[in-house]
């Protein structure tokens, strides 16, 4: 028989009490920096040591990064020591993504951002802010999909059946 478990226990170190479950959608697993400080999913800098941090989709962790000059970035994780990364283009251009791209990946976008098919007009500061917020929610969704090991294919590999996101801006009716 199936055991029903509140979804918050999948990502939280400590199961929530019944009166706290309504907040479970906002809670995610925390991570630990190499300095011992707690890192959260959206962090881009460790508040303890000041190092830049980012999410590594291939390792499913938020980790501190060490710049390697022209050779990209290295995660300060023993099991990822030889791996080189670079920032997602949506981070370098708009500061809306904290996921990394492996240096041997030809795509400029991370595994989450490359699923975008349409984004709003980014010449509007309002659209950039709304897009940042919806990208944050999408990255949480994609983290959950990856963590649960659910299969998915992007539209870049399957144009008709692959997963893709169309983020449209509201239009004013004049």
Label each PLM-derived region with a short phrase.
Residues 37-40, 53, 92-95, 101, ...:
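Cys/His-rich microdomains that often coordinate metals
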Residues 50-60, 113-122:
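Short Cys/His-rich micro-motifs in 6-15 aa windows
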Residues 28-31, 42, 81-84, 103-106:
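Short metal-coordination and nucleic-acid-contact micro-motifs, chiefly zinc-binding Cys/His arrays
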Residues 2-5, 18-21:
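Short, low-complexity intrinsically disordered segments enriched in A/P/G/S/L with frequent Arg
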Residues 32-35, 48, 87-90, 112-115:
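Short, cysteine/histidine-rich loop/knuckle motifs that typically chelate Zn2+
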Residues 133-174:
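Auxiliary, metal-adjacent structural segments of Zn-dependent hydrolase domains
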Residues 108-134:
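Fold-level signature of zinc-dependent metallopeptidase catalytic domains
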């Amino acid at each position: 028989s199936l055991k029903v478990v509140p979804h918050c226990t999948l990502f939280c170190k400590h199961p929530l009490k019944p009166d706290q479950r309504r907040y479970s959608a906002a809670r995610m697993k925390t991570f630990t920096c190499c300095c011992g400080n707690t890192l959260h999913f959206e962090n881009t800098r460790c508040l303890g040591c000041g190092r830049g941090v980012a999410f590594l989709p291939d390792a499913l962790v938020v980790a501190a990064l060490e710049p390697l000059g022209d050779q990209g970035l290295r995660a300060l994780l023993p099991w990822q020591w030889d791996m080189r990364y670079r920032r997602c283009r949506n981070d370098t251009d708009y500061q809306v993504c904290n996921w990394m791209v492996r240096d041997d990946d030809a795509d400029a976008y991370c595994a989450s951002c490359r699923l975008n098919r349409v984004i709003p007009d980014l010449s509007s500061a309002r659209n950039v802010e709304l897009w940042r917020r919806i990208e944050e929610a999408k990255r949480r969704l994609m983290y959950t999909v990856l963590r649960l090991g659910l299969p998915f294919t992007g539209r870049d590999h399957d144009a008709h059946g692959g997963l893709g996101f169309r983020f449209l801006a509201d239009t004013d009716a004049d």
